[in-house]
């Protein structure tokens, strides 16, 4: 998605440890027009998947997930990372390691909002090692729902997440594919049909 790549080039910052900081438009300050376009793009890519719910993990996945749900006309569920006083029983849970924060969080989704007939699209802001998506897959397995794929805003192609998900049969659609962050520069992988 060229618009997203341009935002990354303009506002993204490469930090030590192969971290790409995009807090100017995605995970602190949010560009709602870009998020709307991201949601429309995911909806177009998965238009024939008969999706009934969109899932993500709080908090950076919420904006693109909500816009995807809006474009598809389906509800959005975000897995919580922290216990809530209002959501304290009847939960599906999984442990997820955060690459950027170097911590493990227990994510949870209420059984109340999950139906065994659901066809779920997973949305995440980044795909590096695939831990957040893997956690959502574990919850989907516990719930007995079908995952139709994973929509990723920014994929780090030089890390194993996408290949590991593909090996499990998960369809991955990434809007920006970063091939390298070497020397503080963001390089993108060319996709089929691009010059």
UniProtKB/Swiss-Prot annotation:
Chain positions recorded as 5-phospho-alpha-D-ribose 1-diphosphate binding sites: 128-132
Endoplasmic reticulum keyword on record: no
GO terms under biological process: purine ribonucleoside salvage; xanthine metabolic process; XMP salvage
Keyword annotations of the record: Cytoplasm, Glycosyltransferase, Purine salvage, Transferase
Main location: cytoplasm
Coiled-coil ranges from the UniProt annotation: none
Residues annotated as binding xanthine: 20, 27, 156
Keyword RNA-binding: no
Entry's EC annotation: 2.4.2.22
InterPro entries linked to this entry: PRibTrfase_dom (IPR000836), PRTase-like (IPR029057), Pur/Pyrimidine_PRTase (IPR050118), Xanthine_PRibTrfase (IPR010079)
Pathway: Purine metabolism; XMP biosynthesis via salvage pathway; XMP from xanthine: step 1/1
Localisation per UniProt entry: Cytoplasm
HAMAP family given in the database record: XPRTase
Function according to Swiss-Prot or TrEMBL: Converts the preformed base xanthine, a product of nucleic acid breakdown, to xanthosine 5'-monophosphate (XMP), so it can be reused for RNA or DNA synthesis.
Quaternary structure and interacting proteins, as annotated: Homodimer.
Name used for this protein in its record: Xanthine phosphoribosyltransferase
High-level lineage: Bacteria, Bacillati, Bacillota, Bacilli, Lactobacillales
